[in-house]
From Swiss-Prot:
GO cellular component: a single term: cytoplasm
Protein family (similarity comment): Belongs to the KAE1 / TsaD family.
Domain of life according to the entry: Bacteria
Name listed for the protein in its UniProt record: tRNA N6-adenosine threonylcarbamoyltransferase
Species of the source: Pectobacterium atrosepticum (strain SCRI 1043 / ATCC BAA-672) (Erwinia carotovora subsp. atroseptica)
Length: 337
């Protein structure tokens, strides 16, 4: 089965073609970072309009990359949520329209299920069961995963997601949008001993997160210590260490609670090298394994949507002609297959 995947949940337009026998055949991506940079964040209306301009050309490019024609596609998968409602509607409308025209089934895909399953695209995919750390600009969640659609929420952020905290703190440090990756690069030159940031909610039981206080702590530290280059690097290092330590502590607790030996990390922040190294050390000490996707599949992309859609379509999932999206959509609401 060859599935066309369309991702338009936020500020990346992603299109990919996944073959259940041959693997990934095409992957096209357009980022709107430059479009939104002057505003310091994503402007929903601008995002939607840009998806309108880019989605169909990217579909054409994906077909060319794969050497396929429209009648070679067996199904269409599109992100139906969570995300920006206008942006979601673009991908959903295009996906449903193509499925109707091509007379193939279409399936709505949960954006975070796409992230969760992205490591399945790698040569050494994780086996069930596992604990998943979904960590991005919009979500920070720990999930017990025992099968496709068998998801149990263990803990989540009660305020800012980790990726959001990275971007907001980067802005305080004078970095351009999106600042998270630049903050991590700056942190490499920082002194880990100069500042100590708190590890929020690690002093009590539970698996929930809170990152908004770290942003406030960073702002106060900047005001008290100036903003020369070395001080900014030291603050970036202290902030990143605090986030990574907090995530690692909560992952250990989740693994203890479930008894699982495998950890999957997914979402944009899972590309962070410091986080990968730390969780690799955690799992090595436990005699377990950690899995993650290659960096280009950590951020939003069409490949993860095409793959997740192929799994659902193989088990008979499809949707009627109606186009519906869900800006808010709990992962636990998905049916098992």
């Amino acid at each position: 089965m060859r599935v066309l995947g369309i991702e338009t949940s936020c500020d990346e337009t992603g299109v990919a073609i996944y073959d259940t026998e041959a693997g990934l055949l095409a992957n096209q991506l357009y980022s709107q970072v430059k479009l939104h940079a002057d505003y310091g964040g994503v402007v929903p209306e601008l995002a939607s309009r840009d998806h309108v301009r880019k989605t169909v050309p990217l579909i054409q490019a994906a077909l060319r990359e794969a050497g396929l024609q429209a009648d070679d596609i067996d199904g269409v998968a599109y992100t139906a949520g969570p995300g920006l409602v206008g942006a979601l509607l673009v991908g959903a409308t295009v996906g449903r329209s193509l499925a109707f025209a091509w007379e193939v089934p279409a399936v709505p895909v949960h954006h975070m299920e796409g992230h969760l399953l992205a490591p399945m695209l790698e040569d050494n995919p994780p086996a069930f069961p596992f604990v998943a750390l979904l960590v991005s600009g919009g979500h920070t969640q720990l999930i017990s995963v025992t099968g496709i659609g068998e998801y149990r929420l263990l803990g989540e952020s009660v305020d800012d997601a980790a990726g959001e905290a990275f971007d907001k703190t980067a802005k305080l440090l004078g970095l351009d949008y999106p600042g998270g990756p630049m903050l991590s690069k700056m942190a490499q030159a920082g002194d880990s001993q100069r500042f100590t940031f708190p590890r929020p909610m690690t002093d009590r039981p539970g698996l929930d997160f809170s990152f908004s206080g770290l942003k406030t702590f960073a702002a106060n530290t900047i005001r008290s210590n100036g903003d020369d280059d070395q001080t900014r690097a030291d603050i970036a290092r202290a902030f990143e260490d605090a986030v990574v330590d907090t995530l690692a502590i909560k992952c250990r607790r989740a693994l203890d609670d479930t008894g699982f030996k495998r950890l999957v990390m997914a979402g944009g922040v899972s590309a962070n090298r410091t986080l990968r190294q730390r969780l690799g050390e955690v799992m090595a000490k436990r005699g377990g394994e950690v899995f993650y996707a290659r960096p280009e599949f950590c951020t939003d992309n069409g490949a993860m949507i095409a793959y997740a859609g192929s799994v659902r379509l193989l088990h008979g999932a499809s949707q009627t002609l109606g186009v519906s999206v869900r800006p808010r959509w709990p992962l636990a609401d998905l049916p098992a297959v």
